[in-house]
């Protein structure tokens, strides 16, 4: 287990040594609360776009199902006749310049794995730049848009926003409810009371704390041929090498077990870069990975490599709330 994995486990399961990090946590909280206070006071260089901005983000470190939810939002807004664009930091990307327009034929190294996945799946206009405000300006200069989705920009207070959606992993919750580095929180837990909606990935039902949503496996997709097959292609009891370089790899492995397959787990760091040698496992079995990993592996994939396509399925109550908010922000939509 890596040092990062051990720290993550301590945040969510508890460890007495974390008390040593509380002075650093206090400093961190002062910084993030100061940034938030300046934003609310309208101080500093804050950009307000001429179209509504919907931020989808986390207050916890680690995966929460954000990318599948963004894919849902893109398709849902398009179904309402809206022209949607996306801006993202582009974590791990090495583009020639910034801001950078992501195209479907680019590499994950150049565009970032999550932005490339979003563009390949939807064809949406997408701009990456750590400066989200600059990314929005650049995207609007190229595209006539009705709405901007900001991927993981909750703490980027230089960009004004009209709606804030925060995602939480229902199984992990907020861990020990402490901020970095003593806990997994990017902002204090009280921040949840200020956002427009909280969505809990894996929750059974909506609650006073927020809306529920789940990730629904929909197909097996071959990395070499692009062939899309039903989940029944793998019979119950099928053993597979399972590769996951995401924020919470165990969630992927649990999903495969829930489908009655027998995964041999191979967890990697979030946004990991791969080569063929790293993914050469024994015994010979089909290899199954996340779609986020697949965008980095097609160039050297073998014939029996697949990814599991998943779709975010929020509750009807969230969809009703979202439609009312879109109608308020974009009259006639």
From Swiss-Prot:
GO terms for molecular function: ATP binding; tetraacyldisaccharide 4'-kinase activity. Keywords: ATP-binding, Kinase, Lipid A biosynthesis, Lipid biosynthesis, Lipid metabolism, Nucleotide-binding, Transferase. Transfers the gamma-phosphate of ATP to the 4'-position of a tetraacyldisaccharide 1-phosphate intermediate (termed DS-1-P) to form tetraacyldisaccharide 1,4'-bis-phosphate (lipid IVA). SUPFAM superfamilies: P-loop containing nucleoside triphosphate hydrolases (SSF52540). Pathway: Glycolipid biosynthesis; lipid IV(A) biosynthesis; lipid IV(A) from (3R)-3-hydroxytetradecanoyl-[acyl-carrier-protein] and UDP-N-acetyl-alpha-D-glucosamine: step 6/6. The keyword Signal does not apply. Belongs to the LpxK family. GO terms for biological process: lipid A biosynthetic process; lipopolysaccharide core region biosynthetic process. It comes from Ectopseudomonas mendocina (strain ymp) (Pseudomonas mendocina). It catalyses: a lipid A disaccharide + ATP = a lipid IVA + ADP + H(+). GO terms for cellular component: plasma membrane. This is Tetraacyldisaccharide 4'-kinase. It holds the Pfam family LpxK. ATP binds at residues 60-67. Coiled coil: none annotated. NCBIfam families: lpxK. The keyword Transport does not apply. InterPro entries: LpxK, P-loop_NTPase. Its EC number is 2.7.1.130.
């Amino acid at each position: 287990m890596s040092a990062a994995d051990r720290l993550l486990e301590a945040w969510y399961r508890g460890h007495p040594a974390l008390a040593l990090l509380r002075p650093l946590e206090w400093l961190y909280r002062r910084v993030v609360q100061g940034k938030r206070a300046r934003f609310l006071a309208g101080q500093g260089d804050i950009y307000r776009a001429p179209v509504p901005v919907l931020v989808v983000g986390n207050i916890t470190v680690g995966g929460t199902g954000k990318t599948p939810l963004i894919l849902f939002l893109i398709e849902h807004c398009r179904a309402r006749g809206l022209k949607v664009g996306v801006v993202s930091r582009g974590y791990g990307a090495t583009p020639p310049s910034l801001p950078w327009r992501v195209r479907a034929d680019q590499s994950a190294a150049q565009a970032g794995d999550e932005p490339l996945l979003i563009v390949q799946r939807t064809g949406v206009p997408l701009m990456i730049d750590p400066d989200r405000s600059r990314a929005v300006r650049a995207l609007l200069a190229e595209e006539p848009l009705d709405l901007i989705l900001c991927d993981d920009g909750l703490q980027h207070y230089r960009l004004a926003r009209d709606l804030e959606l925060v995602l939480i992993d229902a199984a992990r919750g907020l861990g020990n409810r402490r901020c970095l580095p003593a806990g997994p929180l990017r902002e204090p837990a009280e921040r949840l009371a200020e956002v427009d909606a909280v969505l809990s990935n894996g929750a059974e039902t909506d609650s006073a704390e927020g809306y529920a949503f789940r990730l629904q496996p929909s197909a097996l997709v071959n990395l070499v041929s692009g062939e899309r097959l039903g989940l029944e292609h793998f019979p119950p009891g099928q053993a597979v090498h399972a590769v996951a370089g995401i924020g919470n790899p165990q969630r992927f492995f649990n999903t495969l077990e829930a489908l009655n397959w027998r995964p041999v787990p191979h967890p990697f760091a979030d946004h990991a870069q791969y080569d063929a040698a790293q993914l050469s496992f024994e015994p010979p079995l089909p290899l199954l990975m996340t779609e986020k990993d697949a965008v980095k592996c097609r160039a050297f994939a073998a014939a029996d490599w697949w990814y599991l396509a998943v779709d975010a399925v929020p509750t009807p109550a969230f969809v009703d709330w979202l439609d009312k908010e879109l109608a308020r922000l974009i009259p006639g939509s």
